[in-house]
Amino acid sequence: MKILLTCLLAITAFAADVTKPHIPLAQQPLRMAKDITAFEAADQANPPPQHALLFTGASTLRMWKNVGEEMKPYPVINRGFGGSFTTEVLGYMDRITLPYHPRVVVFQCGGNDINSGDPVAAPIARIREYLARLRKENPDCAVVFVATTRAPSRKAKWPLLDEYNRQLEQIVKEGKNLWYVDINVALNLPNGEGKPGSYLKDNLHPAAEGYKAIASVLKPAVDAAWQATEAAYKK
């Protein structure tokens, strides 16, 4: 009887979890306030340069420890944080994007939104809002949008991630001084599986070799964006 009761409770709990409705991220509170406060404290202690190359987004950027070396000679500010959603990159942009008056922004975020259950249209709309606010305050800024990774651990979400990347690329086609970089060609094999050594054991985040591969496809776009803004930032 105890075994039967245990099984019934387990089934009930599983069913409740499966049927639990997704709460849209736009209706959820912003997380990781401590990370943002830490960035602000670091800025107070050692003010970063204005008109730099700003990286903003989620953990793929946060974990890129040698991004400054890979992106030389440009001055780099890395403000990737946690496993952030686009709601948070947008919600905190007054604190960790706009104060820097960046010359070029490298933006990668959105995959976590989709993995959480938000439809593709939701992060795409937030990215459009982010871009509009950025350009209102900093009209000469260029943006390099980085595709979300089709990581092996998220294989079930690949079709949605592919659609997200297509729509992200469309944003770039519609605007000026925008670039789109598909890092999946650097990280993954033609069949979609990760190249040997590209990912950590979690099959989600890039390993050191993966970051080298990302840099090889990202740096040319950063070079082009920096050159395109040369005249605007000479004044």
What are these regions (language model features)?
Residues 1-54, 65, 69-70, 174, ...:
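N-terminal secretory targeting modules
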Residues 20-22, 26-28, 73-87, 115, ...:
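Acidic/histidine-rich helix-loop elements
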Residues 54-56, 77:
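Conserved beta-strand elements of the Class I
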Residues 61-77, 86-125, 144, 148-152:
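Oxyanion-hole/transition-state-stabilizing segment in secreted/luminal serine hydrolases
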Residues 79-84, 106-119, 128, 135, ...:
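Cell-envelope and extracellular/periplasmic
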Residues 120-130, 158-165:
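Charged helix-capping and loop-helix junction motifs
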Residues 138-142:
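A short helix->loop->beta-strand "cap" motif at the edges of active sites that frequently abuts
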Residues 150-235:
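Catalytic His-Asp segment of secreted/periplasmic serine-dependent ester chemistry enzymes
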